[in-house]
Regions:
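Sequence/structural segment immediately N-terminal to covalent heme-attachment motifs in c-type
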Residues: 57-82, 144-145
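Beta-strand-rich recognition/accessory modules
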Residues: 290-291, 311, 319, 323-332, ...
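Periplasmic/extracellular electron-transfer cofactor-ligation site
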Residues: 17-19, 46-47, 70-92, 116-119, ...
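Gly/Gly-Pro-rich "capping" loops immediately C-terminal to redox-active cysteine motifs
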Residues: 1-8, 24-27, 83-110, 128
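C-terminal capping alpha-helices of c-type cytochrome domains
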Residues: 6-12, 26-58, 128-164
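General marker for long, soluble alpha-helical cores
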Residues: 47, 59-62, 98-101
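Beta-strand-rich N-terminal accessory domains
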Residues: 162-300, 304-311, 322-348
Length: 387
């Protein structure tokens, strides 16, 4: 069941993946065991890994896997630890180490029929006779569900913690009015501002970079890290489908579309944060200056399915004519046009009011919107983000 790399580690260096067992593994050394690794692997092999095609983007697949592992579905966390989090029952093997140790095809076979490989095991059969006990997730497809869990666990210790383990959580739940949470947020500068909506589509705006940096679905924020004791460290979004938007100056004047986007601190590029105001519904509008131009940025939920999106409106009002001005809303490895929109690394951007362009610069795909405008006028663009 172990992959070749982990077999080498065990035979050459030893390992302690089961701290609850009072046993020690000798360190034999590579000179004594070098040929055994290949022999073990070839003797136990039962064929090639079968490819599995996912029906959804990977960020949604991982969210479904997280749901399955947590206390709302298969409850793997009742027996298995998850990095630093103890299981709610017996303390079995850490799930975040599994993909580092195991062979993918063995993982599939074992989950389908644990008793076949370990008679008398406490491991329950979640896919008896190949049928899932959670048919409402990923259409009940057993192969897809197991592959989803494997893909989720490939993130190792960086995998998002399943539901049911953070028992001291202080979850902030938006109601009639959005919640504005100003604190240290993972992936942002220390000037992060998270905004949560009852529509379960949320974002985090970075007052250092003058732009939204994170968007996500589901639960909003767990405030326990910052509201208990001295509140050290950064908090990650509590929900799923967390997507990252580019840092750096949001606006730039480019003499040529071949020119690189400015980097460094936006304050060194003529930007100054001017705070935010709340409308009657409690929705913030962020304000900043870019040289002689005033800029506002408002983000609201956008109703769609299967999960709501976000609607962003950016308005630029210059004191003098603004030429060759561009707004950068996305930067990623992949970008493709689809039904009048542009999809960049899993986020779909639909632009209203302007004609965007996609360019390749420094091996990155950037989505830019022209914001050239005369003095005394305004340039406004509406951006609908779904993911």
């Amino acid at each position: 069941k172990l992959n070749e790399n982990w077999l080498k580690t065990i035979l050459n260096e030893g390992a302690k993946d089961r701290p609850y067992m009072a046993t020690r593994m000798p360190k034999f050394g590579a000179s004594q065991t070098g040929s055994l690794v290949t022999l073990f692997a070839s003797t136990d092999a039962l064929g090639e890994d079968k490819p599995v095609t996912f029906p959804e983007p990977e960020h949604r697949i991982k969210a479904d896997a997280r749901l399955m592992i947590g206390d709302q579905a298969l409850s793997c966390i009742k027996c298995h630890t998850f990095d630093k989090y103890a299981a709610t029952g017996i303390q079995s093997l850490d799930m975040t180490t599994m993909t580092r140790r195991l062979r993918r095809e063995w993982f599939h076979r074992y989950l389908l029929d644990p008793q076949k490989y370990r008679s008398g095991t406490r491991m329950p059969a979640a896919w008896p006779k190949g049928r899932s006990v959670v048919p409402h997730i990923l259409n009940g497809d057993s192969d897809v569900q197991i592959e989803a869990i494997w893909t989720y666990l490939l993130d190792g210790k960086n995998a998002k913690v399943p539901s049911g383990l953070q028992r001291e959580a202080i979850e902030l739940r938006p109601g009639d009015r959005p919640i504005v949470y100003r604190n240290f947020i993972e992936g942002l500068s220390p000037r992060g501002i998270a905004v949560g909506f009852a529509a379960k589509a949320h974002f985090a705006w970075d007052a250092e970079h003058m732009t939204p940096r994170l968007i996500w679905h589901g639960a909003f924020i767990d405030a326990a890290k910052h509201w208990v004791d001295r509140g050290p460290g950064n908090q990650v979004p509590l929900g799923d489908h967390v997507m990252t938007l580019p840092a750096g100056p949001p606006l730039a004047s480019l003499e040529s579309l071949d020119g690189a986007w400015p980097d460094g601190n936006p304050r060194d590029n003529g930007f100054a944060f001017k705070g935010y105001s709340l409308d009657k519904a409690g929705v913030p509008t962020f304000k900043y200056r870019w040289n002689e131009a005033t800029v506002t940025d408002t983000i609201l939920p956008f109703e769609t399915s299967p999960d709501n999106g976000l609607q962003r409106t950016v308005t630029v009002a210059p004191a003098n004519k603004l030429e060759n001005a561009w707004l950068r809303i996305a930067s990623g490895q992949n970008a493709e046009e689809s039904d009048g929109a542009v999809i960049v690394d899993g986020v779909r951007f639909q632009i209203e009011g302007k004609e965007p362009i996609v360019r390749t610069i420094n091996n990155r795909r950037e989505l830019l919107i022209p914001m050239t405008v005369n003095a005394g006028e305004t340039a406004t663009v509406r951006i609908i983000m779904t993911w």
